[in-house]
Regions:
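Key DNA-contact positions within bacterial/archaeal DNA-binding proteins
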Residues: 39
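Conserved ATP-binding N-box helix of the HATPase_c
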Residues: 103-131
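Helix-loop-beta hinge of the Bergerat
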Residues: 75-102
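Short, hydrophobic-biased segments on the C-terminal half of alpha helices
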Residues: 45-46
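Conserved short strand/loop->alpha-helix "switch" segment adjacent to the catalytic nucleotide/phosphoryl-transfer site
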Residues: 28, 32-33, 92-113
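Conserved beta-strand-loop-beta-strand hairpin that lines the nucleotide-binding pocket
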Residues: 55, 61-74, 120-150
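Short amphipathic alpha-helical interface segments
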Residues: 8-28, 32-33
Length: 150
């Protein structure tokens, strides 16, 4: 178990909330916002990488950071009469949503079941691909079918 962090949670949160829009200059932006040294900001970034919340791409001069997926799930399902969207939600997606606030879970459930119901009832497709991705700041769900697209 890693040692207890003495890092300022406000700095960590700032980095995580802003890295998507500032992948190449998150260090400079954090220095400007908090008045920290480059070394100190680098420690924050390295800790977030070690914790699996950020990932780095490129070498030192061209290094870019991005949020790392905490969860990434994809699966295919057969669209058939009698398929219940709430069962797919309950059995396949909901178990992946650990530590997500209940109000967010409720919104995601509504969106997911409506999208899947639409694919079942209206796409005329035989199957669909479901993906669920979650990082520190966002949740992305996609249902892709090969239907008629109206």
């Amino acid at each position: 178990m890693p040692a207890k962090s003495r890092q300022n949670p406000e700095v960590r949160e700032f980095i995580l909330r802003n890295v998507a829009t500032h992948p190449a200059d998150i260090g400079s932006l954090t220095i400007q916002e908090f008045g920290l040294s480059r070394t100190s900001v680098n420690r924050y970034v390295l800790r977030l990488i070690e914790e699996g919340l950020l990932e780095a791409e490129g070498n030192t001069r061209a290094r870019r950071y991005k949020l790392r997926n905490i969860v990434s799930v994809g699966f295919s399902i057969k669209l058939s009469f009698g398929l219940f969207e709430d069962a797919i939600w309950r059995d396949r997606i909901l178990p992946e949503m650990k530590d997500v606030p209940q109000n967010v879970v409720d919104i995601c459930q509504y969106g997911f079941t409506e999208m899947l119901n639409n694919a079942i009832d209206h796409s005329a497709s035989f199957d669909c691909l479901v993906t669920y991705e979650q990082d520190y700041c966002s949740i992305k769900m996609m249902i892709a079918d090969e239907g008629i697209g109206i």
